[in-house]
Amino acid sequence: MSCEILRKLEEVIRRRIEEKNPESYTYRLYSSGIHNVARKVGEEAVEVAVAALAEGKSRIVEEAADLLYHLLVLLNSTGLSLGDVCAELERRMR
């Protein structure tokens, strides 16, 4: 299974940040600063862990999707991309 949806999501995130629409959650999160974005990633990671320990599979999937979204916003906020992470994973597999 390909995860092309992550690349599409990354593009949507980039576009929403560029549009600077104050009604966009993505833009508001991004413009709140790296500390808030990082805090949100931490919160979502904890929610994935809690779901894994005490909730069903569907809840784990939902929380993991939230974590991936917020991680992509974090990467964008630091000038990185999903491609950078994929390159590192490929390097580690050698």
UniProtKB/Swiss-Prot annotation:
Name of the protein in its database record: Phosphoribosyl-ATP pyrophosphatase
Catalytic activity: 1-(5-phospho-beta-D-ribosyl)-ATP + H2O = 1-(5-phospho-beta-D-ribosyl)-5'-AMP + diphosphate + H(+)
Subcellular location: Cytoplasm
Pathway this chain belongs to: Amino-acid biosynthesis; L-histidine biosynthesis; L-histidine from 5-phospho-alpha-D-ribose 1-diphosphate: step 2/9
Top-level enzyme category: hydrolase
Originating gene: hisE
Molecular-function GO term, any one: phosphoribosyl-ATP diphosphatase activity
Coiled coil: none
GO cellular component terms given for this protein: cytoplasm
Domain of life: Archaea
HAMAP family reported for this sequence: HisE
Keyword Nucleotide-binding: yes
Family to which the UniProt record says this protein belongs: Belongs to the PRA-PH family.
